[in-house]
Amino acid sequence: MTTLTTLPSIFVPLVGLVFPAIAMASLFLHVQKNKIF
């Protein structure tokens, strides 16, 4: 049962850091490819 309680404490910062990083990287690549700015 200890793994069930420790999983959220690992996934919350992981999702909070990795998801915005992937979103910003994909947005940056999208802008670089299309040369909007």
From Swiss-Prot:
It is a single-pass membrane protein. The chain crosses the membrane at residues 9-29. The keyword Transmembrane applies. It comes from the Eukaryota. SUPFAM superfamilies: Subunit VIII of photosystem I reaction centre, PsaI (SSF81540). Keywords: Chloroplast, Membrane, Photosynthesis, Photosystem I, Plastid, Thylakoid, Transmembrane, Transmembrane helix. It is found in: Plastid, Chloroplast thylakoid membrane. InterPro entries: PSI_PsaI, PSI_PsaI_sf. One of its GO terms (biological process) is photosynthesis. One of its GO terms (cellular component) is photosystem I. Belongs to the PsaI family. May help in the organization of the PsaL subunit. This is Photosystem I reaction center subunit VIII. The lineage of its organism: Eukaryota, Viridiplantae, Streptophyta, Embryophyta, Tracheophyta.
